[in-house]
Amino acid sequence: KSGNNWYYLDSDGEMAIDTLIEDGDNYYYVDINGVMAANQWVAIENEDAGEDDEPEHYWYYFQANGKALTNGDNDKVSLKTINGKKYAFDEDGKMLFGWVDDDSAERVDDSDGDGFKEGVYYFGGEDDGAMTVGWIQLDITYDEATEDDYKYTAAAFNDDEDQSRWFYFKSNGKKVYAENGDRTKDKTING
């Protein structure tokens, strides 16, 4: 520590700069000046960028103690509130975005455009990540939409696979969908 700032020395005794540091189950980030990030969002380059459904970078939120928020040991989504909005993170501290499965607390692969089928939550785009509540219209690009019998997906699509669809998410962030083999779900919302 120097003044109000914390720094990290690597195994060679050199000050670490512009890097994510893993210390046991905790993750920290030091900036280009070696100062530990605290109470802030940081975008860190994704080494797997360019592969299927992989973003250019991942967002992390570092708390006052410098530790990245994570999902911890939870198997299910554990929501974290930051500046009045709810977010979810994986076990490594990466902010989840897009369609997210409740049971595994992981992003649903949406590279084929069918993430809406398994996704329970929707956390916006890769640079947003805030949990969706209420109505949202999303563009769906799913090549097999008109032939898919999963929960009657085909019944909701016409000849054009590239369509916009409305989804409704309850106050807990979970998607409302038809259950028990029903083709549709009638739900009174706000009235």
Model-derived features: positions:
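Extracellular adhesion/carbohydrate-binding repeat motifs centered on closely spaced tryptophans
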Residues: 1-191
